[in-house]
Structure formats: C-alpha cells, structure tokens
C-alpha cells in the first residue's frame, strides 16, 4: 500500500501535499474560509481575483445553474481590493497563491510589489475573465500587452507566478508560449468561457450583465484539450481547471499533462469534502495501477 506522500506534487519551485487546489472564486475572499478549505484537504489555495481598487461587481442575478454541474456566472470580479485583502491575510499560514486582475501592466506591478512580502507562495495573473470590460480577457487578447505584463511581473517578484488563460480570440497556445518565453512559472488552463442564457418567457438575458462565463462539466473537454496541447507542445507546468468533480476528472487532467488541478464548480456540487474525496480516489488509482506517485502519471497521454 502506498502512503500519503505518493500524492505530493512538486513543480515550479512549489510543493503541495496533494494535487488539488481551490480555484480562484467566491470562497477565496477571507482567511476564515481559506483556512477551512485547507483543513478540508486542499493541497493549495488560490484567492479570489484582487484588483488595485475595490470592485462592487454586478447586481443579481449573477449565477445560473444549468444542470447541477455546469454554471454561467457574471459576478463582475467583485472584491475588496488588494490592500484590504492584504490586511485580511496578515497572519496567513496556509499555502496560498494570490490571484490578481488589472487593466494595465502598472496595475499588476503595483500589486505584486506591495503583496510580495506577505506569507504567500506566489501569484496567479488573471488575463482571462470573459465578462468584465478592460480587464481579464480584454487584456489577455492583446499578445504584446500579455508579454509586457508577464515580463514586468517576473522582474518584480522572485516568487512563482502563473498566467491564467482562457479560450478567447487569441490561440491559447500562443498566449502560453509568451508566458513561457517571458519566464512565467507556468499557466493555469482554463478560465470560464464566454456564454449567455435567455429567459424564453420575458425574452431578456437572465444574468444582469447579459454575458457571463460558462464553467463546470460543460467546459471540461475543452480544458483537457488545452492542458494537453500546452503541456505537450511547450513543456511548461500547467495547472488544470474546468469541470473537475471526481477523482476520474482529476486523473484525466493529470494524464493530459497537468501538474495540479483546481476545483471550483465541484465545491458547489459536492461540498468542500470534494478535496479529500478526489485525493483518496487518486491514491487508490495509483496503487491499483502500480504507480508510485502522482508525478508518474503527469502527461502519460502524450505517448499516444
């Protein structure tokens, strides 16, 4: 029988007790919730995306549940601003990565400089939120802007940082290549996909913003493809995200080339026990297949 150390993952100068991570989202906004998620079994935590100034976000409705395993959301990147969150996590002892969002290179540089001294593992640079103007994907669709942001973040922190990519107007492989060339530690793939739902009785969009981001089961095949192509063609660390509810989902991402996996929608469907459940399933899979550790299966699908 293999031990718990078989779940340990090491990549980009980081080490987690298991490959499951809290995805950036509504649970990552307070120290209390972050610590609770870590105690519930997550290997690492990612905060909600933080901006230079507080963002109120959109009015309700902001989330649509499609089938229990797929959602469309447009929260509008609501957050208290990075300075308020920095005060919230002053005493942080959990393995935490801060997600940052901005409109310009200077936004990211300012935040990184101020946050770098905190007890955190590193940063995730959100260049792919699909429903907020002048942020996220609108920034990420400009290859030269992405290049400039990644280059300046690298100059201003020695910590690992990952570029969160989505499916937009630019080939995700080109974006990942820029991230690699400008010395990002890796990428997270993928963010939600631009989507919409309309009330057939009223004829109006259901979300207050009209357009939102599709997440959950519906985007998993797209996410698997993106992880597979980035990992196989570029050979950089990839954190997989999109539709992970079970250990089988997580293993599929690992086989595609993900070094770790982020879970968001799965919490809404299965609760915070999903982290331990997935880790237990991965360990049983490794044992049944004769593998020694998670690293043995990362990218195995590249052989075919």
Regions found by a protein language model. Give the residues of each.
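Alpha/beta catalytic cores of nucleotide-metabolism and tRNA/nucleoside-modifying enzymes
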Residues: 1-3, 214-235, 245-304
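N-terminal capping/small domains of soluble enzymes
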Residues: 1-96, 101
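Hydrophobic faces of well-ordered beta-strands that scaffold small-molecule active sites
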Residues: 20-24, 43-47, 96-100, 123-125, ...
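Glycine-rich beta-to-alpha transition loops that act as phosphate-gripper elements at the mouths
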Residues: 25-27, 99-103, 165-171, 220, ...
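Catalytic cores of alpha/beta
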Residues: 31-36, 107-117, 169-182, 232-234, ...
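Glycine-rich phosphate-binding active-site loops on the catalytic face of alpha/beta enzymes
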Residues: 47-52, 127-133, 186-196, 243-244, ...
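Glycine/Thr-rich beta-alpha phosphate-binding loop at enzyme active sites
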Residues: 70-74, 79, 130-144, 175-232, ...
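Conserved alpha/beta-domain cores
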Residues: 100-157, 165, 173-185, 189-190, ...
């Amino acid at each position: 029988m293999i031990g718990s150390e078989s779940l340990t993952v090491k990549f980009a100068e980081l080490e987690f007790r298991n490959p499951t991570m809290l995805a950036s989202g509504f649970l990552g906004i307070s120290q209390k919730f972050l610590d609770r998620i870590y105690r519930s079994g997550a290997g690492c935590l990612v905060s909600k995306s933080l901006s230079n100034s507080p963002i109120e976000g959109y009015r309700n409705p902001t989330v649509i549940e499609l089938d229990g395993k797929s959602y469309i959301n447009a929260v509008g990147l609501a957050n208290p601003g990075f300075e308020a969150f920095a005060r919230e996590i002053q005493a942080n002892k959990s393995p935490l990565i801060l997600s940052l969002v901005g409109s310009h290179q200077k936004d990211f540089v300012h935040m990184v400089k101020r946050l770098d001294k905190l007890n955190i593992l590193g940063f995730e640079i959100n260049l792919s939120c699909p429903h907020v103007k002048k942020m996220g994907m609108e920034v990420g669709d400009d290859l030269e802007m992405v290049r400039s942001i990644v280059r300046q973040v690298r100059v201003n922190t020695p910590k690992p940082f990952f570029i969160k990519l989505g499916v937009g107007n630019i080939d995700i492989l080109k974006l990942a290549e820029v991230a690699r060339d400008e010395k990002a530690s890796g990428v997270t793939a993928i963010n939600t996909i631009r989507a919409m739902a309309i009330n057939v009785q009223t004829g109006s969009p259901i979300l207050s913003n009209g357009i939102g981001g599709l997440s959950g089961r519906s985007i998993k095949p797209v996410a698997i493809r993106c992880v597979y192509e980035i990992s196989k063609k570029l050979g950089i660390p990839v954190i997989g995200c999109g539709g992970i509810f079970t250990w089988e989902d997580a293993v599929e991402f690992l086989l595609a080339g993900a070094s770790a996996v982020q879970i968001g929608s799965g919490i809404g469907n299965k609760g915070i026990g999903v982290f331990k459940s997935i880790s237990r399933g991965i360990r049983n899979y490794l044992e049944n297949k004769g593998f020694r550790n998670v690293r043995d299966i990362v990218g195995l699908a590249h052989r075919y």
